[in-house]
């Protein structure tokens, strides 16, 4: 599905805003280059030296299964491109309408959540 230039601009603005917000919190973060089928996510953020792949969505329509599939594929691409043994944690960040970055929703699956909890 092709995205309109307005949609691309909206997404790019959200990505830039998220990176700036993370940096204000002293979290190392950067936007990742778009690479089509080899896309590695929208943003990488490092927490305690660990890469976290963020798939950002600024859309009216929520399609969490599709968003999550994208995050999984892109985290795998990130790991492959860098020769990492483990795929980084991945998250879908969904912009809430008429709300700031700090009110965005963060989505992950329960399996990853329990892994992060050390279980």
Locate predicted features:
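Catalytic phosphate/metal-binding cores of nucleic-acid and nucleotide-processing enzymes, i.e., regions
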Residues: 1-119
